[in-house]
């Protein structure tokens, strides 16, 4: 009986040592640490190239606002209504005007234009200009738009090609 108790006691001690180590690996893995470094959180702020660094909390807030306001059509950085135009970095950079910076994305959310910049699509695409089309946009503040833009630009740095890559990643 004593040897059984000793064996159980040793096993329990081993588990007590192992559990915190496993929790630490799950909560603070090297991939997680790299994911939120300053370089990852830094994105172009305007067309001139001025950089802006967001905090992890700001990006998480931007993600929540994005998922609530835009996620119905743009989950994972795709565009459900037009798979040719997503939110991946290359597509944003090739738009006219380029939408690969915070200011340009905020401007687009306020008054969207076609991909070539030739005409307004505010009557078709949710925006601040015509919040009747999609009421979720109605009460968004400029700060929330800025945080969503930050999230859109940071997401591909964290998710890689899965952001804007389409349904093969879901």
Swiss-Prot record:
Which Pfam families does this entry report, sorted A to Z?
Cytochrom_C550
- Residues spanning the membrane: none
Q: Which GO terms describe its biological process?
A: photosynthesis, light reaction; respiratory electron transport chain
Name the major location. membrane
User: What is the membrane topology listed in the Swiss-Prot or TrEMBL record?
Assistant: Peripheral membrane protein
- InterPro entries noted in UniProt: Cyt_c-like_dom (IPR009056), Cyt_c-like_dom_sf (IPR036909), Cytochrom_C550 (IPR029490), PsbV_cyt_c550 (IPR017851), PsbV_cyt_c550-like (IPR016003)
Show the Gene3D superfamilies listed in the entry.
Answer: Cytochrome c-like domain
On whether Transport is a keyword of this UniProt record, the answer is yes
Per the entry, which co-factors are needed? heme c
Q: What does this protein do?
A: One of the extrinsic, lumenal subunits of photosystem II (PSII). PSII is a light-driven water plastoquinone oxidoreductase, using light energy to abstract electrons from H(2)O, generating a proton gradient subsequently used for ATP formation. The extrinsic proteins stabilize the structure of photosystem II oxygen-evolving complex (OEC), the ion environment of oxygen evolution and protect the OEC against heat-induced inactivation. Low-potential cytochrome c that plays a role in the OEC of PSII.
Check the record and name the NCBIfam families matching this protein: PS_II_C550
Name the protein family.
Belongs to the cytochrome c family. PsbV subfamily.
Q: Tell me what this protein is called.
A: Photosystem II extrinsic protein V
Source organism: Parasynechococcus marenigrum (strain WH8102)
Q: What is the lineage of its organism?
A: Bacteria, Bacillati, Cyanobacteriota, Cyanophyceae, Synechococcales
Q: Which gene encodes it?
A: psbV
């Amino acid at each position: 009986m004593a040897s059984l108790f000793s064996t159980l006691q040793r096993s329990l001690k081993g588990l007590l040592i192992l559990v915190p180590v496993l929790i630490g690996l799950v909560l603070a893995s090297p991939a997680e640490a790299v994911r939120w470094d300053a370089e990852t959180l830094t994105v172009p702020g305007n067309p001139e190239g001025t950089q802006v660094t967001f905090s992890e909390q700001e990006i998480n807030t931007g993600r929540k606002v994005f998922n609530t306001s835009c996620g119905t059509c743009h989950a994972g950085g795709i565009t459900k209504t037009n798979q040719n135009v997503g939110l991946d970095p290359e597509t944003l950079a090739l738009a006219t005007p380029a939408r690969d910076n915070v200011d340009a994305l905020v401007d687009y959310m306020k008054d969207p234009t076609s991909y070539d910049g030739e005409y307004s699509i505010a009557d078709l695409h949710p925006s601040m200009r015509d919040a009747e089309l999609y009421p979720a946009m109605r009460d968004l503040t400029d700060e929330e738009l800025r945080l969503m833009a930050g999230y859109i630009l940071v997401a591909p740095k964290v998710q890689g090609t899965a952001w804007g890559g389409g349904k093969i990643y879901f």
